[in-house]
Amino acid sequence: MIYFGLEYGWATSCKDILLIACGSATSWIVRNILRNKGGLHNRVGTRLKIFPFTLHECEEYVRERRLAYDRRRIAECYMAFGGVAYYWSLLGKGKSPEQNFNQLFFGPQDGLRLEFDELYSSLFKNPKPYIKIILELGTRRAGLTRDDLRAKLKTANGGRLTRYLEDLEECGFIRKYLPVGGKNGGTYQLIDNFSLFFMEFVQGNPSREGDYWTAMLSEGRKNEWRGKAFERLCLEHVPQIKKALGISGVHTEVYSWSRAATAAVRGSQVDLLIDRRDGLINLCEMKYASAEFAITKSEFEKIERRIEAFREVIGAERTIQLTLVTVRGLKPNVYRNDVQAEIVLDDLFAP
């Protein structure tokens, strides 16, 4: 609770004094100041939420620091750090992203090895329940519903879980996406790049050799991570995707969709659907490859099955546009002709 003197007595007779409250504990500010039910109620003049850097802003920062990274390497750093300026400030000049990963996560010095626990401890007075939620969500790429989380965490107090989820969402660690139509329910998904990178490669890893990322970790494992992380990168830059599609001025709703596998049907998942007011739906497939991405016959058949499964939900009257988001574009072949829109990494760097 805010101190009584601040709420009712401090500077009450001074019209030229402003109180500026700032901090990284977004949920605390929302609960105690913006939604204050006491003396601060309805007294907030201006709200200014500071968002993480976008790829465009990270590129400007990299250029300012003379790090000499191309866009693919900037994107790889973003997939590990997100847009948190502090993490970017730790990148050593004259070192590649791979060398920086070695030093910050796997070197003999602590670097960012202790950051995970310190991060949540700095934001939340009692970090344990928040970390439990993060760890649980980290095991499910598509996310979990509130009821699923409650069952897995064996939490009896549903109201408290709701508050924890709201706090994590306010702080940008998780997102809640609604089912197609956006009526009821919702799924919580971990989207914090640093937490996901830490949980996949650093947590429980005793390596202090300083070359784990470049020498000991297989390229296949890294590419698997890049594929998943690139999808999150796209989810964090939907306005840029809309701009590249030429629909910045069109009202849209953004969804994800999944269908669990049963004995009768295959499981299916689409991470990004852009539902447009003009009646079209961009079904986005996000594919990471260091060169041009080639749509193979088997890959195209998988995409077709996803489209047909999704069409069963929305009905035949809606128009679905297959949209491919890749790093360097699509390799020309017969299957490329069935793609209605192409987005490349450069498009995600738009302001």
Where are these regions (language model features)?
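Phosphate-binding site recognition
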Residues: 1-215, 220, 322
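A cross-kingdom feature that marks ATP-driven nucleic-acid transaction machinery
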Residues: 180, 186-351
